[in-house]
């Protein structure tokens, strides 16, 4: 398995890109309301990224993906395509995933939004999924393994009677959008790649209310839960530092 270790200077540049990606998600907060379409949110994000941040939206054209954002509502696990036909409704939960390129470096992050008044069981899934993300992040340090990260996420999810999506994972990142290693959100302690200083990757657990099984819709992108139940996801990009880790996708 080949992957690139980043220098401290590289990581500082990735942090700038990561901060800009986080700022996109923060900016969108006021617009994620009942009645808005995901297509409108995509237009707002594109304008903000290109005109205000002076960055490149990494998703457009990536493997043929047509939009700036991934907008994944309710039972959509990931890769939902924004469109003017999809209107957010009161009670929806939605993940918005964005990646920007700044000075050649990628910043990749996502978060959940609650649309209007959300049922308690949906809010709990969103909250526990965020806890799962940080359970995984907290394992990141030199000498730990990717299995430690996956185990921490899986243990917390399953303790809460949720399931971890198996078919999609985190990934190495830098000047390339997706590189080694693959970061699974399940696993066994002590197994898998040993972490070392300079590794940078995303942790982005997708946690389902029902079973972990998924299917891809006819558009070739949108991934949904096979049983139609809710799914949630949160994502950060992290760097392995000399004594632990640093989150690279924190906003201002």
Regions found by a protein language model. Give the residues of each.
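Active-site neighborhoods and metal-handling regions in enzymes and metal-associated proteins
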Residues: 1-252
């Amino acid at each position: 398995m080949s992957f690139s270790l980043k220098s401290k200077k590289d990581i500082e540049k990735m942090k700038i890109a990561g901060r800009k990606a986080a700022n996109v998600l923060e900016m969108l907060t006021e617009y994620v309301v009942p009645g808005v379409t995901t297509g409108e949110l995509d237009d707002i994000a594109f304008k903000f990224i290109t005109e205000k941040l002076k960055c490149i939206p990494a998703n457009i054209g990536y493997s043929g993906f047509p939009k700036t954002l991934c907008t994944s509502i309710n039972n959509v696990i990931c890769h939902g395509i924004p469109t003017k036909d999809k209107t957010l409704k009161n009670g929806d939960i939605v993940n918005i995933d964005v990646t920007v390129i700044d000075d050649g470096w990628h910043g990749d992050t996502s978060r959940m939004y609650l649309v209007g008044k959300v049922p308690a069981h949906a809010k709990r899934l969103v909250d526990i999924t965020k806890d799962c993300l940080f359970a995984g992040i907290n394992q990141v340090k030199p000498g730990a393994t990717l299995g430690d990260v996956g185990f921490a996420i899986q243990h917390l999810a399953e303790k809460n009677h949720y399931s971890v999506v198996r078919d999609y994972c985190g990934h190495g990142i830098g000047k390339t959008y997706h590189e080694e290693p693959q970061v699974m959100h399940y696993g066994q302690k002590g197994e898998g790649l040993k972490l070392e200083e300079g590794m940078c990757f995303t942790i982005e657990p997708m946690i389902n209310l029902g079973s972990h099984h998924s299917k891809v819709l006819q558009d070739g992108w949108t991934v949904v839960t096979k049983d139609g139940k809710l799914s949630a996801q949160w994502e950060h990009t992290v760097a392995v530092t000399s004594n632990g880790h640093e989150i690279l996708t924190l906003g201002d």
